[in-house]
C-alpha cells in the first residue's frame, strides 16, 4: 500500500496518537522516520519545509507540508473513507466534534504538560504550579464526567476525532497523574478513555493502558 505521508516527531508524543489513530481508521499508512529532537528539526532541510521548526510535522508524497497536530489530524481524518464518522456528517455534528477538540486543546493539554514535565525529568517541581494545574485538571475532568454517560462516546456511538483527541490528550495524564484515588472520582471518564484506547481498530496505536496506582508527589 502506498504511503500517505511522512510524520516527523519524537516518540512518544501525546499529540501524535490522534493522528496515527485517525490514519488507522482510514486505512492510511504514515511513515515515522528516525528523528532526533533539536537536531533533525534544526537542519536546513527541515526548516526549508517547516520554518517554525516544530513537530509533529507532516509531509505528503506530493510535497504538501503541514504543522500543528490538530491540523494534521484534521487532514488525515478528512482523507479517507471514515471521514464522515471522524469529522461529522453535517454542520452540527462537525461543530460538536470541533467543540471537544478545542476543549481538550485549551482546557486540558496545557495543564497536563505542567503536571507531567517535572515528573519525566524535563523541569523542576513548583508547588504553586502543581496546585493550580491539579485544580485545572480536576475542572476539565469534572466537565467530561458530567457530559459522559456510562458506555458512551463524546458525540455519539462511533469514534470521532474528538474521542481520539481526548484520549491522546489524557494519555500522559493517565500514565503519570490520574492515579487510583483520582480515577474513583471520575468513573465515566475512565470508562470512556478505556473504551477509546481499547477499541479494536485503534488499540495498536495507543498500546496497553498504563494506569498508575499512586502518582509521584513533589518535594516542597
From Swiss-Prot:
Keywords, alphabetical: Transferase
Role this protein plays: Glutathione S-transferase-like protein; part of the gene cluster that mediates the biosynthesis of the mycotoxin fusarin C. Within the cluster, FUS1, FUS2, FUS8 and FUS9 are sufficient for fusarin production. The other FUS cluster members are not essential for fusarin C biosynthesis.
Residues in GST C-terminal domain copies: 90-220
Enzyme class: transferase
CDD domains from the UniProt entry: GST_C_EF1Bgamma_like, GST_N_EF1Bgamma
InterPro entries: EF-GSTs (IPR050802), Glutathione-S-Trfase_C-like (IPR010987), Glutathione-S-Trfase_C_sf (IPR036282), Glutathione_S-Trfase (IPR040079), Glutathione_S-Trfase_N (IPR004045), GST_C (IPR004046), Thioredoxin-like_sf (IPR036249)
Cellular component GO terms held in the UniProt record: cytoplasm; nucleus
Protein name: Glutathione S-transferase-like protein FUS3
Superkingdom, natural source: Eukaryota
One annotated GO biological process: translational elongation
Pfam families: GST_C, GST_N
Domain GST N-terminal stretches: 3-84
Family as reported in the entry's similarity comment: Belongs to the GST superfamily.
Keyword Transferase annotated: yes
The protein's Enzyme Commission number: 2.5.1.-
Record GO terms (molecular function): transferase activity
Amino acid at each position: 500500500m502506498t504511503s500517505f505521508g511522512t510524520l516527523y516527531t519524537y516518540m512518544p508524543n501525546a499529540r501524535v496518537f490522534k493522528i496515527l489513530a485517525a490514519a488507522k481508521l482510514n486505512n492510511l499508512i504514515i511513515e515515522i522516520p528516525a528523528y532526533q529532537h533539536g537536531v533533525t528539526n534544526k537542519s536546513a532541510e527541515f526548516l526549508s519545509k517547516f520554518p517554525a521548526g516544530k513537530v509533529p510535522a507532516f509531509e505528503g508524497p506530493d510535497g504538501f507540508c503541514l504543522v500543528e497536530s490538530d491540523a494534521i489530524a484534521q487532514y488525515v481524518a478528512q482523507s479517507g473513507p471514515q471521514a464522515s464518522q471522524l469529522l461529522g456528517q453535517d454542520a452540527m455534528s462537525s461543530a460538536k466534534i470541533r467543540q471537544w477538540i478545542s476543549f481538550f486543546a485549551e482546557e486540558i493539554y496545557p495543564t497536563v504538560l505542567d503536571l507531567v514535565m517535572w515528573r519525566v525529568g524535563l523541569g523542576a517541581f513548583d508547588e504553586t504550579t502543581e496546585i493550580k494545574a491539579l485544580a485545572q485538571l480536576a475542572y476539565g475532568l469534572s466537565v467530561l464526567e458530567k457530559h459522559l454517560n456510562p458506555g458512551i462516546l463524546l458525540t455519539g456511538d462511533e469514534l470521532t476525532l474528538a474521542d481520539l483527541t481526548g484520549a491522546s490528550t489524557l494519555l500522559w495524564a493517565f500514565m503519570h497523574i490520574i492515579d487510583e484515588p483520582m480515577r474513583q472520582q471520575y468513573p465515566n471518564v475512565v470508562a470512556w478513555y478505556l473504551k477509546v484506547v481499547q477499541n479494536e481498530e485503534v488499540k495498536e496505536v495507543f498500546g496497553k493502558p498504563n494506569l498508575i496506582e499512586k502518582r509521584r508527589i513533589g518535594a516542597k
